[in-house]
C-alpha cells in the first residue's frame, strides 16, 4: 500500500492495552486500537494514558491504527528536586 493512501488523525490515548497497544479516542469521536510505530520504539518514545498522539490509518480498516507521533505537553515542567544524573555526586563515573 502506498503512503499516499494512509489517513492521519489526532486523538487522545485513553487506555494502555497488552501487547504494546493503545485505545485512542480520535478527535472525530471514534475509538480505535493502535500500536506504536517502529521509529517510536527505536527512539524509545514512551506513550502514557492522556497523551495527545497522531494516528495513521488505512482507509480499508478504520478500527486499527499506528501511533506515529506523540505531541509534547503544553503544561510547564515542575521541578521536583535536584537534577538527575551525575551532577549531584560530583562526576559522571562511579567509583569502585
UniProtKB/Swiss-Prot annotation:
Residues 71-96 are annotated as: Disordered. Keywords: Cytoplasm, Initiation factor, Protein biosynthesis, RNA-binding, rRNA-binding. Transmembrane segments: none annotated. InterPro entries: NA-bd_OB-fold, RNA-binding_domain_S1_IF1, S1_domain, TIF_IF1. Residues 1-72 form the S1-like domain. One of its GO terms (molecular function) is translation initiation factor activity. One of its GO terms (cellular component) is cytosol. It is found in: Cytoplasm. HAMAP family: IF_1. Component of the 30S ribosomal translation pre-initiation complex which assembles on the 30S ribosome in the order IF-2 and IF-3, IF-1 and N-formylmethionyl-tRNA(fMet); mRNA recruitment can occur at any time during PIC assembly. One of the essential components for the initiation of protein synthesis. Stabilizes the binding of IF-2 and IF-3 on the 30S subunit to which N-formylmethionyl-tRNA(fMet) subsequently binds. Helps modulate mRNA selection, yielding the 30S pre-initiation complex (PIC). Upon addition of the 50S ribosomal subunit IF-1, IF-2 and IF-3 are released leaving the mature 70S translation initiation complex. Belongs to the IF-1 family. NCBIfam families: infA (TIGR00008). This is Translation initiation factor IF-1. It comes from Bradyrhizobium diazoefficiens (strain JCM 10833 / BCRC 13528 / IAM 13628 / NBRC 14792 / USDA 110). The gene is infA.
Amino acid at each position: 500500500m502506498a503512503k499516499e493512501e494512509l489517513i492521519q488523525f489526532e486523538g487522545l490515548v485513553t487506555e494502555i492495552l497488552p501487547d504494546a497497544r493503545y485505545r485512542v479516542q480520535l478527535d472525530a469521536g471514534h475509538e480505535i486500537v493502535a500500536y506504536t510505530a517502529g521509529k517510536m520504539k527505536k527512539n524509545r518514545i514512551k506513550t502514557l494514558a492522556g497523551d495527545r498522539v497522531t494516528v495513521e490509518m488505512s482507509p480499508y480498516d478504520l478500527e486499527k491504527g499506528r501511533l506515529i507521533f506523540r505531541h509534547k505537553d503544553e503544561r510547564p515542567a515542575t521541578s521536583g528536586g535536584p537534577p538527575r544524573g551525575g551532577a549531584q555526586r560530583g562526576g559522571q563515573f562511579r567509583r569502585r
